[in-house]
A protein has these predicted regions:
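Pyridoxal 5′-phosphate
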Residues: 1-404
Length: 404
Protein backbone atom coordinates (compact mmCIF):
# COMPACT_ATOMS: atom_id res chain seq x y z
CA UNK A 1 0.00 0.00 0.00
CA UNK A 2 1.17 3.51 -0.80
CA UNK A 3 1.59 6.19 1.86
CA UNK A 4 -1.79 7.41 3.08
CA UNK A 5 -3.34 10.27 1.09
CA UNK A 6 -6.15 12.24 2.73
CA UNK A 7 -8.85 13.52 0.35
CA UNK A 8 -11.71 13.74 2.87
CA UNK A 9 -11.43 17.39 3.85
CA UNK A 10 -15.16 17.86 3.23
CA UNK A 11 -15.76 15.80 6.39
CA UNK A 12 -13.03 17.42 8.45
CA UNK A 13 -9.74 19.05 7.52
CA UNK A 14 -6.46 17.25 8.07
CA UNK A 15 -3.83 18.20 8.83
CA UNK A 16 -5.00 21.06 10.99
CA UNK A 17 -3.39 24.47 10.74
CA UNK A 18 0.08 24.74 12.27
CA UNK A 19 -0.18 25.85 15.88
CA UNK A 20 -3.63 24.41 16.59
CA UNK A 21 -2.50 21.35 18.54
CA UNK A 22 0.26 23.26 20.33
CA UNK A 23 -2.09 26.03 21.48
CA UNK A 24 -4.63 23.55 22.81
CA UNK A 25 -1.95 21.50 24.57
CA UNK A 26 -0.48 24.62 26.15
CA UNK A 27 -3.88 25.61 27.51
CA UNK A 28 -4.59 22.17 28.94
CA UNK A 29 -1.14 21.83 30.50
CA UNK A 30 -0.59 25.35 31.81
CA UNK A 31 -4.01 26.63 32.82
CA UNK A 32 -7.33 25.39 31.46
CA UNK A 33 -9.29 27.85 33.57
CA UNK A 34 -12.90 28.91 33.12
CA UNK A 35 -13.91 32.36 31.97
CA UNK A 36 -16.55 34.61 33.54
CA UNK A 37 -16.13 32.64 36.76
CA UNK A 38 -12.63 32.84 38.21
CA UNK A 39 -11.40 36.15 39.68
CA UNK A 40 -7.72 35.57 38.98
CA UNK A 41 -5.21 36.57 36.34
CA UNK A 42 -5.17 33.28 34.43
CA UNK A 43 -8.93 33.40 33.87
CA UNK A 44 -8.75 37.02 32.75
CA UNK A 45 -5.99 36.21 30.25
CA UNK A 46 -8.04 33.34 28.83
CA UNK A 47 -11.11 35.56 28.60
CA UNK A 48 -9.04 38.01 26.55
CA UNK A 49 -8.04 35.21 24.15
CA UNK A 50 -11.69 34.26 23.69
CA UNK A 51 -12.51 37.91 22.97
CA UNK A 52 -9.73 38.01 20.37
CA UNK A 53 -11.25 34.93 18.71
CA UNK A 54 -14.65 36.63 18.58
CA UNK A 55 -13.02 39.65 16.96
CA UNK A 56 -11.22 37.43 14.43
CA UNK A 57 -14.49 35.76 13.45
CA UNK A 58 -16.33 39.07 13.19
CA UNK A 59 -13.63 40.37 10.81
CA UNK A 60 -13.55 37.08 8.94
CA UNK A 61 -17.24 37.26 8.05
CA UNK A 62 -17.36 41.07 7.84
CA UNK A 63 -19.65 41.40 10.83
CA UNK A 64 -19.74 44.85 12.45
CA UNK A 65 -19.65 43.77 16.09
CA UNK A 66 -17.75 40.98 17.86
CA UNK A 67 -20.41 40.77 20.57
CA UNK A 68 -22.57 39.00 18.01
CA UNK A 69 -20.23 36.00 17.91
CA UNK A 70 -21.84 33.21 19.92
CA UNK A 71 -20.15 29.85 20.44
CA UNK A 72 -21.80 26.41 20.03
CA UNK A 73 -20.57 22.81 19.86
CA UNK A 74 -20.92 22.79 16.06
CA UNK A 75 -22.80 23.83 12.96
CA UNK A 76 -25.51 21.18 13.31
CA UNK A 77 -26.23 22.51 16.79
CA UNK A 78 -26.34 26.07 15.46
CA UNK A 79 -28.78 25.20 12.67
CA UNK A 80 -31.04 23.36 15.10
CA UNK A 81 -31.02 26.45 17.31
CA UNK A 82 -32.11 28.55 14.37
CA UNK A 83 -34.86 26.27 13.14
CA UNK A 84 -36.28 25.29 16.52
CA UNK A 85 -35.82 28.64 18.21
CA UNK A 86 -37.19 30.84 15.45
CA UNK A 87 -39.94 29.03 13.54
CA UNK A 88 -43.47 28.95 14.92
CA UNK A 89 -46.62 27.00 13.96
CA UNK A 90 -47.92 28.13 10.60
CA UNK A 91 -44.53 29.35 9.39
CA UNK A 92 -43.06 28.43 6.02
CA UNK A 93 -39.44 28.49 4.84
CA UNK A 94 -37.61 28.01 1.56
CA UNK A 95 -34.57 25.75 1.30
CA UNK A 96 -32.39 24.64 -1.59
CA UNK A 97 -32.74 21.13 -3.01
CA UNK A 98 -29.10 20.46 -2.05
CA UNK A 99 -29.47 20.76 1.72
CA UNK A 100 -27.65 18.70 4.33
CA UNK A 101 -29.60 16.70 6.90
CA UNK A 102 -28.54 19.29 9.49
CA UNK A 103 -31.33 21.39 7.97
CA UNK A 104 -33.67 18.76 6.54
CA UNK A 105 -34.06 16.53 9.59
CA UNK A 106 -34.96 19.37 11.98
CA UNK A 107 -37.46 20.67 9.41
CA UNK A 108 -39.03 17.23 9.15
CA UNK A 109 -39.31 17.12 12.94
CA UNK A 110 -40.99 20.53 12.90
CA UNK A 111 -43.62 19.39 10.40
CA UNK A 112 -45.67 18.02 13.32
CA UNK A 113 -45.85 21.62 14.60
CA UNK A 114 -47.42 22.90 11.37
CA UNK A 115 -44.10 24.29 10.11
CA UNK A 116 -43.50 23.64 6.42
CA UNK A 117 -40.85 24.08 3.75
CA UNK A 118 -40.59 24.29 -0.02
CA UNK A 119 -37.47 23.37 -1.98
CA UNK A 120 -35.90 25.75 -4.48
CA UNK A 121 -35.05 23.37 -7.35
CA UNK A 122 -31.48 23.13 -8.57
CA UNK A 123 -30.32 21.77 -11.90
CA UNK A 124 -28.54 18.43 -12.17
CA UNK A 125 -25.15 20.13 -11.81
CA UNK A 126 -26.24 21.94 -8.65
CA UNK A 127 -26.88 25.30 -10.31
CA UNK A 128 -29.57 27.26 -8.46
CA UNK A 129 -31.30 30.21 -10.12
CA UNK A 130 -32.25 33.08 -7.79
CA UNK A 131 -35.26 34.04 -9.89
CA UNK A 132 -36.89 30.66 -9.20
CA UNK A 133 -37.11 31.61 -5.54
CA UNK A 134 -39.58 34.48 -5.77
CA UNK A 135 -42.40 32.42 -7.24
CA UNK A 136 -42.24 30.14 -4.18
CA UNK A 137 -42.66 32.88 -1.57
CA UNK A 138 -45.95 32.71 0.34
CA UNK A 139 -47.52 35.18 2.78
CA UNK A 140 -46.44 32.89 5.62
CA UNK A 141 -42.84 32.51 4.37
CA UNK A 142 -40.45 33.69 7.09
CA UNK A 143 -37.01 32.71 5.87
CA UNK A 144 -34.73 31.36 3.19
CA UNK A 145 -32.27 28.82 4.56
CA UNK A 146 -29.57 27.35 2.36
CA UNK A 147 -26.02 26.12 2.20
CA UNK A 148 -23.43 28.30 0.50
CA UNK A 149 -21.91 25.37 -1.37
CA UNK A 150 -22.98 21.78 -1.86
CA UNK A 151 -21.13 19.29 0.31
CA UNK A 152 -21.77 16.68 -2.40
CA UNK A 153 -20.67 18.32 -5.65
CA UNK A 154 -19.05 21.59 -4.53
CA UNK A 155 -21.34 23.89 -6.54
CA UNK A 156 -21.51 27.41 -5.06
CA UNK A 157 -24.98 28.91 -4.68
CA UNK A 158 -25.61 32.60 -5.54
CA UNK A 159 -26.10 33.83 -1.98
CA UNK A 160 -25.50 37.49 -2.81
CA UNK A 161 -28.37 37.58 -5.30
CA UNK A 162 -30.61 35.53 -3.03
CA UNK A 163 -29.74 37.76 -0.08
CA UNK A 164 -30.86 40.77 -2.09
CA UNK A 165 -34.20 39.10 -2.81
CA UNK A 166 -34.60 38.36 0.89
CA UNK A 167 -33.83 41.97 1.77
CA UNK A 168 -36.36 43.24 -0.74
CA UNK A 169 -39.05 40.77 0.35
CA UNK A 170 -38.32 41.22 4.08
CA UNK A 171 -37.33 37.60 4.61
CA UNK A 172 -34.83 36.24 7.10
CA UNK A 173 -31.77 34.82 5.28
CA UNK A 174 -29.73 32.03 6.84
CA UNK A 175 -26.62 30.53 5.25
CA UNK A 176 -24.83 27.29 6.11
CA UNK A 177 -21.13 27.85 5.33
CA UNK A 178 -19.86 24.42 6.37
CA UNK A 179 -18.01 23.87 3.08
CA UNK A 180 -17.21 27.46 2.10
CA UNK A 181 -15.89 29.15 5.24
CA UNK A 182 -12.11 29.38 4.95
CA UNK A 183 -12.19 28.74 1.22
CA UNK A 184 -13.85 31.90 -0.13
CA UNK A 185 -14.50 35.34 1.30
CA UNK A 186 -17.98 35.65 2.82
CA UNK A 187 -19.35 39.13 3.53
CA UNK A 188 -22.51 38.80 5.56
CA UNK A 189 -23.36 42.48 5.15
CA UNK A 190 -22.98 42.60 1.36
CA UNK A 191 -24.90 39.34 1.07
CA UNK A 192 -27.63 40.51 3.47
CA UNK A 193 -27.10 37.43 5.63
CA UNK A 194 -29.06 37.50 8.88
CA UNK A 195 -27.77 34.21 10.25
CA UNK A 196 -24.46 32.71 9.23
CA UNK A 197 -23.72 29.23 10.56
CA UNK A 198 -20.18 27.90 10.33
CA UNK A 199 -17.97 25.13 11.60
CA UNK A 200 -14.43 25.50 12.82
CA UNK A 201 -13.05 22.11 11.84
CA UNK A 202 -13.30 22.13 8.03
CA UNK A 203 -12.06 25.02 5.88
CA UNK A 204 -11.18 27.06 8.96
CA UNK A 205 -8.64 24.30 9.81
CA UNK A 206 -9.50 24.28 13.50
CA UNK A 207 -10.34 21.43 15.88
CA UNK A 208 -13.54 19.44 15.83
CA UNK A 209 -16.37 20.25 18.18
CA UNK A 210 -16.65 24.00 17.59
CA UNK A 211 -18.99 25.82 15.24
CA UNK A 212 -21.42 28.71 15.27
CA UNK A 213 -23.50 31.29 13.56
CA UNK A 214 -23.52 34.94 12.59
CA UNK A 215 -26.68 37.02 12.38
CA UNK A 216 -26.98 40.53 11.01
CA UNK A 217 -27.69 43.58 13.16
CA UNK A 218 -30.26 46.14 12.11
CA UNK A 219 -32.02 44.04 9.46
CA UNK A 220 -35.61 42.90 9.40
CA UNK A 221 -35.62 39.21 10.08
CA UNK A 222 -36.89 36.65 12.55
CA UNK A 223 -39.16 37.32 15.47
CA UNK A 224 -36.77 35.23 17.49
CA UNK A 225 -33.15 34.27 17.01
CA UNK A 226 -31.91 30.95 18.35
CA UNK A 227 -29.18 30.55 20.92
CA UNK A 228 -25.60 29.34 20.85
CA UNK A 229 -22.82 29.52 18.29
CA UNK A 230 -19.14 29.85 17.43
CA UNK A 231 -19.63 32.54 14.96
CA UNK A 232 -22.76 34.33 15.93
CA UNK A 233 -25.64 36.54 15.01
CA UNK A 234 -26.15 40.28 14.84
CA UNK A 235 -29.57 41.76 15.35
CA UNK A 236 -31.34 45.04 16.03
CA UNK A 237 -32.06 46.07 19.63
CA UNK A 238 -35.82 45.93 19.07
CA UNK A 239 -35.66 42.42 17.69
CA UNK A 240 -33.22 41.28 20.35
CA UNK A 241 -35.76 42.18 23.05
CA UNK A 242 -38.13 39.57 21.61
CA UNK A 243 -35.66 36.69 21.87
CA UNK A 244 -36.08 33.82 24.31
CA UNK A 245 -33.01 31.56 24.55
CA UNK A 246 -33.68 27.87 24.11
CA UNK A 247 -30.87 27.03 26.52
CA UNK A 248 -30.75 28.66 29.94
CA UNK A 249 -28.26 28.30 32.75
CA UNK A 250 -25.17 29.75 34.33
CA UNK A 251 -23.25 32.43 32.46
CA UNK A 252 -21.06 33.91 35.20
CA UNK A 253 -22.88 37.20 34.75
CA UNK A 254 -25.95 38.62 36.51
CA UNK A 255 -25.93 35.58 38.79
CA UNK A 256 -28.29 37.31 41.22
CA UNK A 257 -31.07 36.94 38.66
CA UNK A 258 -32.96 33.77 37.82
CA UNK A 259 -33.47 35.14 34.31
CA UNK A 260 -30.92 34.95 31.52
CA UNK A 261 -28.88 38.12 30.84
CA UNK A 262 -30.46 40.24 28.13
CA UNK A 263 -27.24 41.21 26.36
CA UNK A 264 -24.95 39.52 23.84
CA UNK A 265 -23.22 37.13 23.89
CA UNK A 266 -24.07 36.02 27.45
CA UNK A 267 -27.76 35.76 26.62
CA UNK A 268 -27.08 32.71 24.44
CA UNK A 269 -24.02 31.10 26.06
CA UNK A 270 -25.13 29.04 29.05
CA UNK A 271 -22.72 26.64 30.68
CA UNK A 272 -19.02 26.08 30.15
CA UNK A 273 -17.65 26.91 26.73
CA UNK A 274 -15.35 24.61 24.78
CA UNK A 275 -12.32 26.73 25.63
CA UNK A 276 -9.65 24.37 24.23
CA UNK A 277 -11.60 24.30 20.97
CA UNK A 278 -11.92 28.08 20.87
CA UNK A 279 -8.20 28.53 21.53
CA UNK A 280 -7.41 26.02 18.78
CA UNK A 281 -9.71 27.90 16.43
CA UNK A 282 -7.92 31.14 17.33
CA UNK A 283 -4.63 29.59 16.20
CA UNK A 284 -6.23 28.35 12.98
CA UNK A 285 -7.72 31.76 12.17
CA UNK A 286 -4.34 33.38 12.81
CA UNK A 287 -2.79 30.98 10.31
CA UNK A 288 -5.49 31.77 7.75
CA UNK A 289 -4.93 35.50 8.24
CA UNK A 290 -1.19 35.14 7.75
CA UNK A 291 -1.42 32.78 4.77
CA UNK A 292 -4.36 34.48 3.08
CA UNK A 293 -7.64 32.85 2.07
CA UNK A 294 -7.12 33.89 -1.53
CA UNK A 295 -3.79 32.05 -1.73
CA UNK A 296 -5.28 28.98 -0.06
CA UNK A 297 -8.26 28.96 -2.41
CA UNK A 298 -6.03 29.39 -5.45
CA UNK A 299 -3.94 26.36 -4.45
CA UNK A 300 -7.01 24.22 -3.77
CA UNK A 301 -8.62 25.13 -7.08
CA UNK A 302 -5.40 24.41 -8.97
CA UNK A 303 -5.45 20.92 -7.46
CA UNK A 304 -9.14 20.56 -8.33
CA UNK A 305 -8.50 21.60 -11.92
CA UNK A 306 -5.69 19.06 -12.20
CA UNK A 307 -7.95 16.33 -10.82
CA UNK A 308 -10.81 17.22 -13.19
CA UNK A 309 -8.43 17.14 -16.14
CA UNK A 310 -6.82 13.82 -15.22
CA UNK A 311 -10.02 12.01 -14.26
CA UNK A 312 -11.20 12.38 -17.86
CA UNK A 313 -8.61 9.73 -18.68
CA UNK A 314 -10.72 7.24 -16.69
CA UNK A 315 -13.78 6.53 -18.89
CA UNK A 316 -15.57 4.61 -16.12
CA UNK A 317 -15.70 7.73 -13.93
CA UNK A 318 -18.49 10.29 -14.17
CA UNK A 319 -17.97 13.71 -12.55
CA UNK A 320 -21.14 14.71 -10.70
CA UNK A 321 -21.99 18.40 -10.84
CA UNK A 322 -20.05 21.10 -12.62
CA UNK A 323 -17.40 19.90 -15.04
CA UNK A 324 -15.26 23.05 -14.77
CA UNK A 325 -13.87 25.29 -12.02
CA UNK A 326 -16.55 27.94 -12.43
CA UNK A 327 -18.72 28.52 -9.34
CA UNK A 328 -17.39 25.55 -7.44
CA UNK A 329 -15.19 24.64 -4.49
CA UNK A 330 -12.47 22.02 -4.18
CA UNK A 331 -15.06 19.26 -3.73
CA UNK A 332 -15.50 16.70 -6.52
CA UNK A 333 -17.89 13.74 -6.50
CA UNK A 334 -17.45 10.76 -8.79
CA UNK A 335 -19.99 8.14 -9.76
CA UNK A 336 -19.12 4.84 -11.43
CA UNK A 337 -22.48 3.81 -12.95
CA UNK A 338 -21.36 0.30 -13.91
CA UNK A 339 -19.62 -0.44 -10.61
CA UNK A 340 -20.21 -0.37 -6.86
CA UNK A 341 -18.93 2.97 -5.55
CA UNK A 342 -18.40 1.50 -2.10
CA UNK A 343 -16.15 -1.24 -3.44
CA UNK A 344 -14.12 1.27 -5.45
CA UNK A 345 -13.65 3.55 -2.44
CA UNK A 346 -12.65 0.54 -0.34
CA UNK A 347 -10.09 -0.51 -2.95
CA UNK A 348 -8.66 3.01 -3.12
CA UNK A 349 -8.04 2.97 0.62
CA UNK A 350 -6.91 -0.63 1.00
CA UNK A 351 -4.66 -0.84 -2.05
CA UNK A 352 -3.49 2.76 -2.47
CA UNK A 353 -3.98 4.46 0.89
CA UNK A 354 -6.38 7.04 -0.58
CA UNK A 355 -8.96 8.20 1.96
CA UNK A 356 -12.27 9.54 0.58
CA UNK A 357 -15.90 9.52 1.59
CA UNK A 358 -18.44 7.34 -0.18
CA UNK A 359 -22.22 7.24 0.08
CA UNK A 360 -24.91 9.88 0.48
CA UNK A 361 -22.89 12.37 2.57
CA UNK A 362 -25.89 13.11 4.84
CA UNK A 363 -27.55 14.89 1.91
CA UNK A 364 -30.13 12.59 0.27
CA UNK A 365 -32.05 15.49 -1.30
CA UNK A 366 -28.88 16.63 -3.03
CA UNK A 367 -28.38 13.16 -4.46
CA UNK A 368 -31.95 13.12 -5.74
CA UNK A 369 -31.26 16.45 -7.44
CA UNK A 370 -27.96 15.21 -8.88
CA UNK A 371 -29.50 11.86 -9.96
CA UNK A 372 -27.13 9.81 -7.80
CA UNK A 373 -29.69 8.10 -5.57
CA UNK A 374 -29.46 5.54 -4.11
CA UNK A 375 -25.84 4.67 -4.90
CA UNK A 376 -24.35 7.99 -3.83
CA UNK A 377 -20.89 9.10 -4.89
CA UNK A 378 -17.22 8.96 -3.98
CA UNK A 379 -16.27 12.43 -2.77
CA UNK A 380 -12.83 13.97 -3.08
CA UNK A 381 -12.33 17.18 -1.08
CA UNK A 382 -8.90 18.76 -1.40
CA UNK A 383 -6.88 20.83 1.04
CA UNK A 384 -4.10 23.25 0.18
CA UNK A 385 -1.86 20.80 2.07
CA UNK A 386 -2.47 18.24 -0.70
CA UNK A 387 -0.14 18.03 -3.69
CA UNK A 388 -0.25 17.42 -7.43
CA UNK A 389 1.79 14.28 -6.82
CA UNK A 390 -0.92 12.88 -4.55
CA UNK A 391 -3.55 13.46 -7.21
CA UNK A 392 -1.36 11.78 -9.80
CA UNK A 393 -0.99 8.78 -7.47
CA UNK A 394 -4.77 8.64 -7.18
CA UNK A 395 -5.23 8.69 -10.96
CA UNK A 396 -2.57 5.99 -11.28
CA UNK A 397 -4.58 3.91 -8.81
CA UNK A 398 -7.70 4.33 -10.92
CA UNK A 399 -5.79 3.29 -14.04
CA UNK A 400 -4.62 0.14 -12.30
CA UNK A 401 -8.07 -0.66 -10.91
CA UNK A 402 -9.67 -0.37 -14.34
CA UNK A 403 -6.60 -1.43 -16.34
CA UNK A 404 -6.77 1.78 -18.37
Amino acid sequence: MEQNIYFDNGSTSWPKAPGVAASMTKLLESGAFNINRGNYEGAYELENQVLKTRMQLARFFHAPDSRCVVFTPGITYSLNCLLKGFLKPGDHVLVSSLEHNAVMRPLCQLASQDIHYTMIPAETDGTTHPESLEALIRPETKAVIMLHASNVCGTILPIREIGEICRRRHLFFAVDTAQSAGSVDIDMQKCNIDFLAFTGHKGLLGPQGVGGRVGKKGQRGPRAVPPQGIGGFLISEALDQELTPLIAGGTGSQSDSLLMPDYLPDKYESGTLNLPGIIGLHAALTYLDETGISAIHQKKMALTGHFLEKIREIPQAHVVGRQTLQDRLAVVSLDFPDYDNVEIAFALEQDYGIMTRVGLHCAPMAHQTLHTMPQGTIRFAFSHFNTVEEIDQCIAGFRELFSV
